[in-house]
Curated annotation (Swiss-Prot):
Protein name: Myoglobin
Gene: mb
Residues noted as binding heme b in the record, renumbered to the chain: H89
Annotated O2 binding sites: H60
Record EC number: 1.7.-.-, 1.11.1.-
Binding partners and assembly: Monomeric.
Substrates-to-products reaction catalysed: Fe(III)-heme b-[protein] + nitric oxide + H2O = Fe(II)-heme b-[protein] + nitrite + 2 H(+); H2O2 + AH2 = A + 2 H2O
Organism: Notothenia neglecta (Yellowbelly rockcod)
Predominant subcellular localization, coarse grouping: cytoplasm
Residue ranges constituting the Globin domain according to the UniProt record: 2-141
Length: 147
């Protein structure tokens, strides 16, 4: 619980502008890990230099952060929120678990820059994301999805 609370203390600035921060998260993910762009076919035709200003990238980034905000606010009691997310990402989108670990690190960097998440907050976010990702991985296995 303490980890969730520590991350939530810095969540306000992220929540205040999901589109901008979400676009930044996805653009940075695609820049730092170019292989992840292949997992988003709807962004395939966008030139790398245009990703940051693309409305679709920002909108999807906003969705990612909005869902993460819901998971954070559940403070660990997130099974009902996570199951449908795990199901769609395993069966429809076919997103390997490693990619959630990659985006979690990017979210941590963006939160440090834009929301003042300090070193202790970074550790708390890693702990929180480890729990969420482990639960997703269990859902994936239950669904028979292995990368």
């Amino acid at each position: 619980m303490a980890d969730f609370d520590m991350v939530l203390k810095c969540w306000g600035p992220m929540e205040a502008d999901y589109a901008t921060h979400g676009g930044l998260v996805l653009t940075r993910l695609f820049t730092e890990h170019p292989e992840t762009l292949k997992l988003f076919p709807k962004f395939a035709g966008i030139a790398h230099g245009d990703l940051a200003g693309d409305a679709g990238v920002s909108a999807h980034g906003a969705t990612v952060l909005n869902k993460l905000g819901d998971l954070l606010k559940a403070r660990g009691a997130h099974a009902a929120l996570l199951k449908p997310l795990s199901s769609s990402h395993a069966t429809k989108h076919k997103i390997p678990i490693i990619n959630f670990k990659l985006i979690a690190e990017v979210i941590g960097k963006v939160m440090e820059e834009k929301a003042g998440l300090d070193a202790a907050g970074q550790t708390a976010l890693r702990n929180v994301m480890a729990v969420i990702i482990a639960d997703m991985e269990a859902d994936y296995k239950e669904l028979g999805f292995t990368e």
